[in-house]
């Protein structure tokens, strides 16, 4: 019976998407939450959102052909829909809640991971809060645990400070590359920490606490910079 349930859960999980399709889906969800007056999006608006410099990693240069292929992929998967806007302009909207089986907080986290790639819980709380407010880190972690249980998010590194999370919509080849990249980063950072392993336990604890406080300040500064970037984009549009 457990095997049947596991097979059913696996078959119901969303299938991997191409990088451009993930970017398009992320933009549709993001704009629906942050600029609802301009949503649903036209093809031109979607392309602009895919290629914007703020809140994106990696940077992409999506053209009309790329976007149309990605939209075909999303519609075939049931993750996006085409509608007729005013003046017979074709527009697009996401169906992420139904396709992913999530609510607002879950959609915000998965969207942020699609738009920026792997992140820590602290980074996700700061960045995803522009789409859904997370009052504290515990509330973010509770939602992360739920997404992990649903097979939508996974942890790429062991639990602890700096634990990194990623969505589960990568293609198998992309995921292998990503895991290998994370392993190399961990290996390069392990050497200095081993050299410092002779530090006394109280000193190490104090140092970790100082680093955590610095990270909190960096998260706060990052959030303010992102708000300024968003404001500049609005003024320039």
Swiss-Prot record:
Pfam families, alphabetized: DUF480
Family, per entry: Belongs to the UPF0502 family.
Region of interest (Disordered), residue spans: 187-211
Chain intervals with Polar residues compositional bias: 187-202
HAMAP family reported in the protein's UniProt record: UPF0502
Protein name (database record): UPF0502 protein RB6530
SUPFAM superfamilies associated with the record: Winged helix' DNA-binding domain
